[in-house]
């Protein structure tokens, strides 16, 4: 993942409704939630849910699968883990380098 990819995904999560929706899908696990369940949990209008789902799907953070007459939404856990990894991958690297340099001196 590069900086532009991470930025676009973080931008999608930067909206409180989308973040709440994504967190609900993460909590639901790999089984996901139906669109109706998402709407009930967030207590938002169908049109509002569709708008925010579209943004999360476009960012690759959510997938949808039709099961008979039900649309199931799932968090993309691989992408979520990659995004978290991108954020923490170099955590405190410069601090460690400074510490190692001062220890060597």
Give the positions of each predicted feature.
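N-terminal helix-turn-helix DNA-binding core of bacterial DNA-binding proteins
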Residues: 4-45, 66-79
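A generic local structural motif
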Residues: 8, 58-59
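Amphipathic alpha-helical dimerization/coiled-coil segments
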Residues: 1-5, 23-27, 77-105
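Alpha-helical residues within the helix-turn-helix
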Residues: 40, 57-58
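Short coil turns linking two alpha-helices in DNA-binding domains
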Residues: 45, 50-52
